[in-house]
């Protein structure tokens, strides 16, 4: 008896252009990094101006 092998294709057709998806992923990663840096800068500014108030509010809410 002969055995037949069936070759199955891997997933959808999006793998046809790996450089395009890589470039899009890199662009999204850079945008998220920039947004995260902006948010951290804003938090730093708030803490520089109101560190005492921030700590006081944090402790009042049950933080340690």
UniProtKB/Swiss-Prot annotation:
According to the UniProt entry, its GO molecular function terms are: proteasome binding; protein tag activity
Region annotated Disordered, chain positions: 1-38
**Modification comment:** Is modified by deamidation of its C-terminal glutamine to glutamate by the deamidase Dop, a prerequisite to the subsequent pupylation process.
**Residue location of crosslink Isoglutamyl lysine isopeptide (Gln-Lys) (interchain with K-? in acceptor proteins):** 64
Which GO terms fall under biological process for this protein?
modification-dependent protein catabolic process; proteasomal protein catabolic process; protein pupylation
List where this protein forms a coiled coil. 23-52
The UniProt keywords, alphabetically, are:
Coiled coil, Isopeptide bond, Ubl conjugation pathway
**Region listing for ARC ATPase binding, in residue ranges:** 21-58
Give, as in the UniProt entry, the pathway in which the protein acts. Protein degradation; proteasomal Pup-dependent pathway
Asked whether the UniProt record includes Coiled coil among its keywords, one would answer yes
Residues modified as Deamidated glutamine:
64
Please provide an example of a Pfam family that matches this protein in its UniProt record: Pup
- What free text does the record give on domains? The N-terminal unstructured half of Pup provides a signal required to initiate unfolding and degradation by the proteasome but is not needed for pupylation, while the C-terminal helical half of Pup interacts with ARC to target proteins to the proteasome.
Subunit arrangement?
Strongly interacts with the proteasome-associated ATPase ARC through a hydrophobic interface; the interacting region of Pup lies in its C-terminal half. There is one Pup binding site per ARC hexamer ring.
State what this protein does.
Answer: Protein modifier that is covalently attached to lysine residues of substrate proteins, thereby targeting them for proteasomal degradation. The tagging system is termed pupylation.
Question: Belongs to which family?
Answer: Belongs to the prokaryotic ubiquitin-like protein family.
Q: What is this protein called?
A: Prokaryotic ubiquitin-like protein Pup
Q: Which organism is it from?
A: Mycolicibacterium gilvum (strain PYR-GCK)
The beginning of the lineage is: Bacteria, Bacillati, Actinomycetota, Actinomycetes, Mycobacteriales
């Amino acid at each position: 008896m002969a055995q037949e092998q069936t070759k199955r294709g891997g997933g959808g057709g999006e793998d046809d252009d790996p450089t395009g998806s890589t470039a899009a992923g890199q662009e999204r990663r850079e945008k998220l990094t920039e947004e995260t840096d902006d948010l951290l800068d804003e938090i730093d500014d708030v803490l520089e101006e109101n560190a005492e108030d921030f700590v006081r509010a944090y402790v009042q809410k049950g933080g340690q």
